[in-house]
Amino acid sequence: MTLDQLRIASRRSQLAMVQTNWVRDELQRAHPDLAITIEAMATQGDKILDVALAKIGDKGLFTKELEAQMLLGHAEIAVHSLKDLPTNLPEGLILGCITEREDPSDALVVNEKNQIHKLETLPEGSVVGTSSLRRLAQLRYHYPHLVFKDVRGNVITRLEKLDSGEYDCLILAAAGLQRLGFANRIHQLIPTDISLHAVGQGALGIECVSGQQKVLDILKTLEHESTSKRCLAERSFLRELEGGCQVPIGVRTEINNNELILEGMVASLDGKRLIRDIKKGSVSSAEEIGIDLANELKGRGAGEILEEIFKSARA
């Protein structure tokens, strides 16, 4: 690769393209002489829409095809929603950059007949659409009277299903709705005492081939230090729990002065068990904070909960 060319691998979904176009534009602004092209493609997760994500298996469900392009020398970088990027990357690839995080909250989206309701006032039997086991487990814990139904497809397809009456409400990532221009559909941001967000939610992760210093230098434009530290703690927490993108593990992080605060959660799929705690430490110890919190939750039964989930997924 020469310094005058950069090829970006991306999923071709509408949200992925919005995110990748933003990355391209920011890099182009910082490096006006760089010729940047986008190679868009469908991933396994984009193609299989009639099966719940958790039943497909989650190792690189939305990333493998993009990674193959880089390993074959057809692209220099790949843009991911960081929450979709596994914590263990293929040999030869690294996480080169994490962008500034947008709101990582989960959001409640309702149809016309439920405009009068908040999540806590939805009537018994209301149908809640979500494809996330993390959201499912936490909401079952707090609202066992609601009915949860899997929902797949892109954001527009999901909104159409909601508005047609197939669901009473949806739980979606606030950042995705905002990036797609649907901020007006956010009816309620779900408080973190109800739903901790996914690891990396709201941030973009840019993956690249290891050893490519010229590429890393180009990506420095987009690196956001505090987001990176927060996500480092979150990803080490997830890695230590041996969890993936489709497990009921949630987090919340913040940085106050030089102190990093990580809150983590593991829940059973039936919503009957939920283990949650907080760990604090120096920002420079972000990775260790994640590991320590994971081990604390394991000591309180999180490992057994996850093993039950992994067993049921393999069955």
UniProtKB/Swiss-Prot annotation:
Its EC number is 2.5.1.61. Keywords: Chlorophyll biosynthesis, Porphyrin biosynthesis, Transferase. InterPro entries: HemC, Porphobilin_deaminase_cofac_BS, Porphobilin_deaminase_N, Porphobilinogen_deaminase_C, Porphobilinogen_deaminase_C_sf. CDD domains: PBP2_HuPBGD_like. The modification S-(dipyrrolylmethanemethyl)cysteine is found at residue 245. One of its GO terms (molecular function) is hydroxymethylbilane synthase activity. Its cofactor is dipyrromethane. GO terms for cellular component: cytoplasm. SUPFAM superfamilies: Periplasmic binding protein-like II, Porphobilinogen deaminase (hydroxymethylbilane synthase), C-terminal domain. It catalyses: 4 porphobilinogen + H2O = hydroxymethylbilane + 4 NH4(+). It holds the Pfam family Porphobil_deam. Binds 1 dipyrromethane group covalently. GO terms for biological process: chlorophyll biosynthetic process; protoporphyrinogen IX biosynthetic process. It is an enzyme of class 2 (transferase). Pathway: Porphyrin-containing compound metabolism; protoporphyrin-IX biosynthesis; coproporphyrinogen-III from 5-aminolevulinate: step 2/4; Porphyrin-containing compound metabolism; chlorophyll biosynthesis. The keyword Transferase applies. Monomer. The porphobilinogen subunits are added to the dipyrromethane group. Belongs to the HMBS family. Tetrapolymerization of the monopyrrole PBG into the hydroxymethylbilane pre-uroporphyrinogen in several discrete steps. This is Porphobilinogen deaminase. The gene is hemC.
